[in-house]
Amino acid sequence: MEEDWEQHGEKEEVPLPAKKPDANKWDGEDEEEEVKDSWEDEDELEEKKDEEKVETPKAKPKKTLQQKIVEKEKQKHEEAERRRLEKEAENMTPEQKLAEKLRLQKLQEESDLKNALDTFGVTTLAGGIDGMTPNTKEDFVELSDAIVKKLASYKSDPEYADFLEDLVTKLFAGLPSNNIRKVKGILDNLYLEKQKLEKGDKPKKSKGGKVKARLKLDGENQNFDEYQPKYDDFDEYDDFM
């Protein structure tokens, strides 16, 4: 019996036939395709493409009807002003045309300056008389001192006296007669004191024993209150102005 098992074991093993490929399948069909880990990679590519696209410029907002009306009215006004100036220029003398040209040039320069200040965020010019906006008595005193200081630099000019006469006339032309009379009295006293100083007279003592203050020839900020008159004493000077 043992011999039969040994003989059976010694028999050669018959190899199994190789499996034939399925004729219905294409070559390489069984190979696994490379699958992307996720769809996020594809989304990122799409976003990059969108960013690379040139943005289309947005169309300018259309003007409203009200804006168009305002703009049209402005154009009409400018055209009417231009025609008026042209008509006036036809009747002007050469001197008047030159003066008008200088006036327009000055206006243009002021407009350019204002635009430049607006561009840089400057609202007003710093300091100086132009920057003052007096409201109180102290403010007007400060303005007065600034004007006197400004004009003092021209007092040695030969035309200075004529300039002051013209300036005073223009300044007081619009004031009531009472104000003019008050200033007239101050000038009368100032004139008398000036005369005494120029002649070398000594100041007279008043009843109280005090010497009346002299006028400072070289001072810029003189106090003219001490020269204010009593108006009843100056009726004889009513024809001064």
Curated annotation (Swiss-Prot):
Chief location bin: cytoplasm
Biased composition (Basic and acidic residues): 1-27, 46-58, 69-90
Coiled coil: 31-119
Gene Ontology molecular-function annotations: translation initiation factor activity
UniProt xrefs under Gene3D superfamilies: Eukaryotic translation initiation factor 3 like domains
Keywords, in A-Z order: Coiled coil, Cytoplasm, Initiation factor, Protein biosynthesis
Extent of Acidic residues compositional bias: 28-45
Tagged with keyword Membrane: no
PANTHER family in the record: EUKARYOTIC TRANSLATION INITIATION FACTOR 3 SUBUNIT J (PTHR21681:SF0)
Official protein name in the record: Eukaryotic translation initiation factor 3 subunit J
Species per Swiss-Prot/TrEMBL record: Culex quinquefasciatus (Southern house mosquito)
Upper classification of the organism: Eukaryota, Metazoa, Ecdysozoa, Arthropoda, Hexapoda
